[in-house]
Amino acid sequence: MAPKLQAQFDAVKVLNDTQSKFEMVQILDENGNVVNEDLVPDLTDEQLVELMERMVWTRILDQRSISLNRQGRLGFYAPTAGQEASQLASQYALEKEDYILPGYRDVPQIIWHGLPLTEAFLFSRGHFKGNQFPEGVNALSPQIIIGAQYIQAAGVAFALKKRGKNAVAITYTGDGGSSQGDFYEGINFAAAYKAPAIFVIQNNNYAISTPRSKQTAAETLAQKAIAVGIPGIQVDGMDALAVYQATKEARDRAVAGEGPTLIETMTYRYGPHTMAGDDPTRYRTSDEDAEWEKKDPLVRFRKFLENKGLWNEDKENEVIERAKADIKAAIKEADNTEKQTVTSLMEIMYEDMPQNLAEQYEIYKEKESK
């Protein structure tokens, strides 16, 4: 005998029908060919080249950062190779007045949003100056607590709306972050108040070593938007054009007062979760890695630009050499930054130092002068 409710309301059918509507949006296939002309963004040739330059530069930064970490010259570092399209194409769709609330893997976005590379290196080293962003860089320090940036983004977006700013707040997390309570609280608050926010889930298939299949029964992560009443979209995160267009349209909606959007980018990290001892060979197969390497966002976008006559090996080598020079100069500047002291940390905590800390400050100041 069929359940009584099912005769009038088949909840399973509703679920299946809903999930089937979340098809991954793609503009460029793995060979760099346009598969959906109608969705190609209105970017000039110069902008397309600039986006490619940023992706190449960032891949070199990732390689050098891993090397510097192994040398003991950088502290905490989360590799980014494989996620350049998800990170940089979304940032490229922003305006200077927009705010970025990054996770710990999202340093490239805030670098291209104005953060000096030296500051990024100091952040990795745990130096307080790595958290003191220059005036005009609309970004918060990378969030270490997984998912907490979603609450912060909702708050920043709400403030932008209250102040009548024509700007948005964008934040990022991985698939693992979408399992956190902060994720739901953030998107629900932003949805309820139509705050101008863009929530990006970079679905790289693993929360450290936990596969996505062990995190949720949902067929997509984009469909989680339905529960709070906002649009959700799943895009090919290895396709720079698809990521850009999805982010641009989400931004247009947000500044028009239509509220937030949830974007799931299907991507992959080629390296370990972080350089703090993670070994991806323990939970990923070489066959899986090989399949995703065929989808490399740089290779795909390179082929697209080469077909348009906008990119060649000489141009790429120029960017690589420039990246190496930039990194060398920035790490040298970081090396020459004065060491932090107890008093230097206390000086930046309060505008008016409490009496009990002021007394301790004088004690440490005397010790440090010896």
UniProtKB/Swiss-Prot annotation:
Domain of life: Bacteria
Cofactor: thiamine diphosphate
Gene3D superfamilies, A to Z: 3.40.50.970
Keyword Oxidoreductase included in the entry's annotation: yes
Enzyme Commission number: 1.2.4.1
Reactions catalysed, as given in the entry: N(6)-[(R)-lipoyl]-L-lysyl-[protein] + pyruvate + H(+) = N(6)-[(R)-S(8)-acetyldihydrolipoyl]-L-lysyl-[protein] + CO2
Complexes and interactors: Heterodimer of an alpha and a beta chain.
Protein name per the record: Pyruvate dehydrogenase E1 component subunit alpha
Gene: pdhA
